[in-house]
């Protein structure tokens, strides 16, 4: 009821304004009685993933809480795990506004935010202040003005900063909104990056005396040869897991709708089939050896089960959560 009213109001406003308005209020009121408006008790459905003990297999995808300002509020909603970021070494403003558009006819969003965030030091301070004891993923990226040849330096910088504060780390090489970033998903560039990051991870494990799994987030816009190459590279470099998928550049599913031709990544219902296909292919190509978090177009029980049946160990929601609210978490967890 509360979310229906809130959504009705926010959907009359600019999409990014509504996003910031929601985050500001979640952050402001998380430790007050007003948090009862979104808090809910969700039955425990424990799952072990990469040695991490989760209360349930439904997580918040990266991109919603880029600066880790609302961890407490999202925990109150019942997420089994929360992923914050994408964060970069230095603060950056992102792309020009407007840069976020709703396609309500398809329960979808197009965004070209461009990794807008306040930088990794700010995120780490927010994580410390939250005192969150649940499972926290931290999603890392490179600054827009960092050349791809030096991209691994940005990822390593972020890894070092977040390592002791993260339950797992996600390497984002699949956002379509940082020029050239997706080129890191292919061939020698991918192997070079993953080898460097794996070596850094092993050094950090030795330094801090704790295991922090490293996952890679990939795009849905991969052809069969590319999916096979990515799978081989993830396995050969002993990457701990994969998140499939990010947003799509494909527009055929929303052709003719308002904002359909806006540049950026499309998320929500239209990416569901593509994301599920990538999950299924990853499962097949790796012989089930690679733990998978499925994300993309999950906005009800059947779409969550579809990802799990395709091979995902866990699921994440973002756009579906924007359209359906905290009740979506509860309905999915109850059904699993």
From Swiss-Prot:
Domain of life: Bacteria
GO molecular function terms noted in the UniProt entry: dihydroorotate dehydrogenase (quinone) activity
EC number(s) reported in the record: 1.3.5.2
Biochemical pathway: Pyrimidine metabolism; UMP biosynthesis via de novo pathway; orotate from (S)-dihydroorotate (quinone route): step 1/1
Reaction(s) the record says it catalyses: (S)-dihydroorotate + a quinone = orotate + a quinol
Chain positions recorded as FMN binding sites: 62-66, 86, 139, 172, 217, 245, 268, 297, 318-319
Subcellular locations according to the entry: Cell membrane
NCBIfam families: PRK05286.1-1, PRK05286.1-2, PRK05286.1-4, PRK05286.2-5, pyrD_sub2
Quaternary structure annotation from Swiss-Prot or TrEMBL: Monomer.
Similarity field: Belongs to the dihydroorotate dehydrogenase family. Type 2 subfamily.
Protein name: Dihydroorotate dehydrogenase (quinone)
Organism: Pseudoalteromonas translucida (strain TAC 125)
Gene that this polypeptide is encoded by: pyrD
């Amino acid at each position: 009821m509360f979310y229906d009213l809130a959504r009705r109001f926010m959907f009359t406003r600019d999409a990014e304004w509504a996003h910031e308005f929601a985050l500001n209020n979640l952050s402001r009121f998380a430790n007050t009685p007003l948090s009862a408006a979104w808090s809910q008790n969700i039955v425990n459905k424990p799952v072990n993933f990469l040695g991490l003990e989760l209360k349930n297999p439904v997580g918040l995808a990266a991109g919603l809480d880029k600066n880790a300002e609302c961890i407490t509020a999202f925990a109150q909603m019942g997420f089994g795990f929360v992923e914050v970021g994408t964060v970069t070494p230095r603060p950056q403003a992102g792309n020009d506004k407007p840069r976020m558009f709703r396609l309500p006819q398809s329960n979808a969003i197009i965004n070209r935010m461009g990794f807008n965030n306040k930088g990794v030091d700010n995120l780490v301070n927010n994580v410390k202040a939250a005192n969150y004891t649940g499972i926290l993923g931290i999603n890392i990226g490179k600054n827009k003005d960092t050349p791809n040849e030096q991209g691994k330096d940005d990822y390593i910088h972020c890894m070092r900063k977040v390592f002791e504060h993260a339950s797992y780390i996600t390497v984002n090489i699949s956002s379509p909104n940082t020029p050239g970033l997706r080129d890191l998903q292919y061939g020698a560039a991918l192997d070079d990056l993953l080898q460097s990051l794996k070596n850094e991870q092993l050094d950090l494990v030795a330094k801090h005396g704790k295991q922090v799994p490293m996952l890679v987030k990939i795009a849905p816009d991969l052809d069969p040869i590319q999916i096979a190459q990515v799978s081989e590279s993830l396995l050969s470099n002993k990457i701990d897991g994969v998140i499939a998928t990010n947003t799509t550049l494909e527009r055929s599913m929303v052709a003719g709708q308002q904002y359909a031709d806006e540049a950026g990544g499309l998320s929500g219902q239209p990416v569901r089939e593509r994301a599920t296909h990538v999950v299924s292919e990853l499962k097949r190509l790796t012989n089930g050896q690679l733990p998978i978090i499925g994300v993309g177009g999950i906005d009800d029980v059947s779409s969550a089960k579809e990802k799990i049946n395709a091979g995902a160990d866990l699921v994440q929601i973002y756009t579906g959560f924007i359209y359906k609210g905290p009740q979506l978490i509860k309905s999915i967890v109850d059904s699993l």
